[in-house]
Amino acid sequence: MFNKHVKTFQYGNQTVTLETGEIARQAAAAVKVSMGDTVVLVAVTTNKEVKEGQDFFPLTVDYLERTYAAGKIPGGFFKREGKQSEKEILTSRLIDRPIRPLFPEGFYHDIQIVAMVVSVDPEIDSDIPAMLGASAALVLSGVPFAGPIGAARVGYVNGVYVLNPTKAELAKSQLDLVVAGTSKAVLMVESEAKILPEDVMLGAVVYGHDQMQVAINAINEFADEVNPELWDWKAPETNEELVAKVRGIAGETIKEAFKIRQKQARSAKLDEAWNAVKEALITEETDTLAANEIKGIFKHLEADVVRSQILDGQPRIDGRDTRTVRPLNIQTSVLPRTHGSALFTRGETQALAVATLGTSRDEQIIDALSGEYTDRFMLHYNFPPYSTGEVGRMGAPKRREIGHGRLAKRALLAVLPKPEDFSYTMRVVSEITESNGSSSMASVCGGCLSLLSAGVPLKAHVAGIAMGLILEGNKFAVLTDILGDEDHLGDMDFKVAGTTEGVTALQMDIKIQGITKEIMQIALAQAKEARLHILDQMKAAVAGPQELSAHAPRLFTMKINQDKIREVIGKGGETIRSITAETGTEINIAEDGTITIAATTQEAGDAAKKRIEQITAEVEVGKVYEGTVVKILDNNVGAIVSVMPGKDGLVHISQIAHERVRNVGDYLQVGQVVNVKALEVDDRGRVRLSIKALLDAPAREENAAE
């Protein structure tokens, strides 16, 4: 019934198994990948016909996590999985990025990849198995795909690279890097690091690429065994006559356009060139394929002009050489009521970054397959249509916005203060108000400045820069601080963020095969040069953390004995509610007895702290207290005196006065304030007090007989 094929190979410390032919047999190809107890099912479906009017490659990648994979039932009213989580979106992008450039130009058939996590080992992340499964399934589907690709996670523990580290190993690692590529070249890198030098980062990329060859070879052997039927697809031949026509109509106008330094004016000139081509060559009778071909030729002409100018040593689109960073303008504390803010402008790219401080109750609760955890630092990136001068729909953040926000967050994680040194929850929002290349790196710079503006004691300043590449044969040029057009028309998008000491985040997307270690080395060195230049200007604008905003909450931390937690909370929360209501504060108590008080003023925080200290204080034997009589005991036993909140003691009738007391009520009344001395605290915490001990003893009466 099943034509099942299985391939097993050793990958680092893990055994990987690829299976096909048993599940999802109606898909173009389906592969089940197992790594330890983590199992991912990847299915690829295709459309043999191109849709009418299709002028781009419609590749869709969806990575989905099922809660049953971890033995859980989803929360919420409907009890089923809903929209994709941030982890699912980021992993979908991780699969998409190295695969997309391996499809041939002019291939416009629908391809859908669905990677579904059906079992999860808490120690093994499902992203690497999902990437390997997508690679294998695409090869088995027979589509024109220049793969397979391999993927590897690289850690760095005690100066040694670790292949596919477990969750426990990652906790000790200075690096979390995912690299993907073919047998010949690296295509994608995504990483965060704890301020590592460039040579260590490059070494990790090379190490990961070397190690993934095992996976690539295994997928090739797997495909040879399955022997899939390949698509009979050929790239359309170049119509040289049509190319000449388009060049004749628009060639000179395109060259003139790329001499214009200002983006909007340049775009208008390019529109003029395209409109001339449309008028001359596209009519109502022109079919979609022909129109797409003309559009493709026009785009190629644009790329040829820009690329040839740069490789010939001519100035770039905006007049710069290959190493110059665009002019910078930095302003901090630009918004009066926010906790911290910065306006970071680099050329025609601008980010308004705003930092907000909160308490531990503001931490984001993340219900992941591996277990629930909280996140004290959030960075959200917004890219409104007006940032590029366009009209567009506003709505929920798109995958690109999620990805850019995550990259900026990873860049800043290494310099955040430890929770014990700075117990605030931090949120940064980066509003991209102008965009012409590298807005994610502007978010890194702006995010760092806004946190410093908010008074966050960062370990160091962090800046980011985007690098580009033009490669033709043996000639290449590495570009510093790329524009949007250079990103679209170039061969690489290489983003590096870090401090003066090293790299904190690295992201690389390569559109061609053939990027060498030498090119990556030059790009990293050039990026460091640019990063240090930006850092100098950032430090000149704000040298270190500023004073905490008057509008930010003040956090006061104190530690109490765990046995006292119940007393601070009170019966049904009565005590803690009264403290928060009376002082206007917010109080959070951890299981270990750490108390965090959030207050709008120093006075309110001090008042709440004093109340808690009074509740948790122990009565000291021999100490004098000012107390209040709260009860006169029956049978003339004595009185109960409250010496501090929640702490009462007994003044026995014999301890009220030196003379004989016949009636307690003759000496004490409820509500009366008296000074008492603590005589004893027994094993059960009961307190014995004395008023008499503080009174002068009466002089002895002389014998009357004398």
UniProtKB/Swiss-Prot annotation:
It comes from Neisseria meningitidis serogroup C / serotype 2a (strain ATCC 700532 / DSM 15464 / FAM18). Mg(2+) binds at residues 487, 493. This is Polyribonucleotide nucleotidyltransferase. CDD domains: KH-I_PNPase (cd02393), RNase_PH_PNPase_1 (cd11363), RNase_PH_PNPase_2 (cd11364), S1_PNPase (cd04472). GO terms for molecular function: 3'-5'-RNA exonuclease activity; magnesium ion binding; polyribonucleotide nucleotidyltransferase activity; RNA binding. Residues 622-692 form the S1 motif domain. Its cofactor is Mg(2+). InterPro entries: ExoRNase_PH_dom1, ExoRNase_PH_dom2, ExoRNase_PH_dom2_sf, KH_dom, KH_dom_type_1, KH_dom_type_1_sf, NA-bd_OB-fold, PNPase. HAMAP family: PNPase. Keywords: Cytoplasm, Magnesium, Metal-binding, Nucleotidyltransferase, RNA-binding, Transferase. SUPFAM superfamilies: Eukaryotic type KH-domain (KH-domain type I), Nucleic acid-binding proteins, Ribonuclease PH domain 2-like, Ribosomal protein S5 domain 2-like. One of its GO terms (cellular component) is cytosol. Gene3D superfamilies: GHMP Kinase, N-terminal domain, K Homology domain, type 1, Nucleic acid-binding proteins. Involved in mRNA degradation. Catalyzes the phosphorolysis of single-stranded polyribonucleotides processively in the 3'- to 5'-direction.
